[in-house]
Swiss-Prot record:
It is found in: Mitochondrion; Cytoplasm, Cytosol. Tautomerase that converts enol-oxaloacetate, a strong inhibitor of succinate dehydrogenase, to the physiological keto form of oxaloacetate. It is thereby required to maximize aerobic respiration efficiency by preventing succinate dehydrogenase inhibition. Also acts as a weak oxaloacetate decarboxylase (ODx), catalyzing the decarboxylation of oxaloacetate (OAA) to pyruvate and CO(2), and as such is likely a regulatory enzyme in the TCA cycle. Also displays acylpyruvase activity, being able to hydrolyze acetylpyruvate and fumarylpyruvate in vitro. GO terms for molecular function: acetylpyruvate hydrolase activity; acylpyruvate hydrolase activity; fumarylpyruvate hydrolase activity; metal ion binding; oxaloacetate decarboxylase activity; oxaloacetate tautomerase activity. Mg(2+) binds at E68, E70, D99. Its cofactor is Mg(2+); Mn(2+). This is Oxaloacetate tautomerase FAHD1, mitochondrial. It comes from Pongo abelii (Sumatran orangutan). Keywords: Acetylation, Cytoplasm, Hydrolase, Isomerase, Lyase, Magnesium, Manganese, Metal-binding, Mitochondrion, Phosphoprotein, Transit peptide. It comes from the Eukaryota. The modification Phosphoserine is found at S37. Its EC number is 5.3.2.2, 3.7.1.5, 4.1.1.112. Homodimer. GO terms for biological process: oxaloacetate metabolic process. Requires a divalent metal cation for activity.
Length: 221
């Protein structure tokens, strides 16, 4: 039963990883994209999860793997078509996440008008931190996120810069996809995305709350 599954281990049993693109204006500009009137959504499979202690696996078909730092919102209970005013009642907690992206593959997908599945949804493309209970974050729009590669600061941003707020995103997504307990929504990345290669070490954190470390590896197959 769902009640026997700890939300703190959401990556072991959560079904849906819903990702929001283009939710920070500075990142939209660096990608030479346009700010849209509605969120851009895409999905990752549950096999994309990589909890801390496991590696980030670099697909053999990319030569340009990028990090994208994101706040993840973990759903605490099922919701469908929830109004924006009630959306936060369904949040169980948060996690820091990476949306690892095969940028060269994504660029080709964009040119051909194809979905981003090959670029975004590969195994271990969603590294996650330890779970942060909702009670420890009174306002998720007042967080500072940071990411370093081999000790060099690459990304730094504040969740107050989101284009679409978390309640809006939850409401919007829930009108399309029924969200279940343990599902997670990645809320977009600030500017500073960039490449990583085999043996690079990524460290990232939410200032004052949680941090995580990962190493980039190539799969054995």
């Amino acid at each position: 039963m769902a009640a026997s599954r700890p939300l703190s281990r959401f990556w072991e049993w959560g079904k849906n990883i819903v990702c929001v693109g283009r939710n920070y204006a500075d990142h939209v500009r660096e990608m030479r994209s346009a700010v849209l009137s509605e969120p851009v959504l895409f999905l990752k499979p549950s096999t994309a999860y990589a909890p801390e202690g496991s590696p980030i696996l670099m697909p053999a078909y990319t030569r340009n793997l990028h990090h994208e730092l994101e706040l993840g919102v973990v759903m605490g209970r099922r919701c469908r078509a929830v109004p924006e005013a009630a959306a936060m009642d369904y949040v169980g907690g948060y996690a820091l996440c990476l949306d690892m992206t095969a940028r060269d593959v994504q660029d080709e997908c964009k040119k051909k008008g194809l979905p981003w599945t090959l670029a975004k949804s590969f195994t271990a493309s969603c590294p996650v931190s330890a779970f942060v209970p909702k009670e420890k974050i009174p306002d998720p729009h007042k967080l500072k996120l940071w990411l370093k590669v081999n000790g060099e600061l690459r990304q730094e941003g504040e969740t107050s810069s989101m284009i679409f707020s978390i309640p809006y995103i939850i409401s919007y997504v829930s009108k399309i996809i029924t969200l279940e307990e343990g599902d997670i929504i990645l809320t977009g990345t600030p500017k500073g995305v960039g490449p990583v290669k085999e043996n690079d070490e990524i460290e990232a954190g939410i200032h004052g709350l949680v941090s995580m470390r990962f190493k980039v590896e190539k799969p054995e197959y």
